Amino acid sequence: MSETYDFLFKFLVIGSAGTGKSCLLHQFIENKFKQDSNHTIGVEFGSRVVNVGGKTVKLQIWDTAGQERFRSVTRSYYRGAAGALLVYDITSRETYNALTNWLTDARTLASPNIVIILCGNKKDLDADREVTFLEASRFAQENELMFLETSALTGENVEEAFLKCARSIPNKIESGELDPERMGSGIQYGDASLRQIRQPRGSAAQTKQQCNC
């Protein structure tokens, strides 16, 4: 009945309205393009189990509305997110210019160490491009983000965007930047034995003490 997995990661898909966030989620979950997609009202949800470094990981993905009138609602879903796709439309400079605000929200409301990948969506509309690859690459580098251009229509780089983000999370667990034992980390163990992943530097006693708080 229930799915078995080693880890569960909470993901967000954030960005301005009309950037194709719901279509990216649908392409990743269903492996097909979502025709006649309307603007998301509030939040939508999807999940998929993937393989990350030999571990089975369930991605629990929240697709948030990009319209300003829903921001107060969607911000509540940022809490406890381990990863995020920050999406803009390569044919709309307005959506690109709004990225800083979305990024600030994510790092303030979710976690300073949330893993974020910048996605320039609608790559299939290259002839109508308003934001160059180089410009977005620089933004990503300056803000310590991963970066890919994607197409929810053709599926190009959609799978890779989610998986690239997911692959970075175990590294942050091992380095101590993300702590699955901390409430709101956006990470849950499906297999209790995996708690050993974060026992470097002789921190077992410290972790035990933290858990008793």
From Swiss-Prot:
Activity regulation as described: Regulated by guanine nucleotide exchange factors (GEFs) which promote the exchange of bound GDP for free GTP. Regulated by GTPase activating proteins (GAPs) which increase the GTP hydrolysis activity. Inhibited by GDP dissociation inhibitors (GDIs).
Top class in the EC scheme: hydrolase
UniProt motif (Switch 2) ranges: 65-74
Binding locations of Mg(2+): 22, 40, 63
Localization per Swiss-Prot or TrEMBL: Cell membrane; Early endosome membrane
Lipidation (S-geranylgeranyl cysteine): 211, 213
InterPro entries: P-loop_NTPase (IPR027417), Rab4 (IPR041819), Rab_GTPases_membrane_traffic (IPR050209), Small_GTP-bd (IPR005225), Small_GTPase (IPR001806)
Positions where Cysteine methyl ester occurs in the chain: 213
Domain text: Switch 1, switch 2 and the interswitch regions are characteristic of Rab GTPases and mediate the interactions with Rab downstream effectors. The switch regions undergo conformational changes upon nucleotide binding which drives interaction with specific sets of effector proteins, with most effectors only binding to GTP-bound Rab.
Protein name in UniProt: Ras-related protein Rab-4B
Source organism per UniProt: Danio rerio (Zebrafish)
Record lineage: Eukaryota, Metazoa, Chordata, Craniata, Vertebrata
Encoding gene (name): rab4b
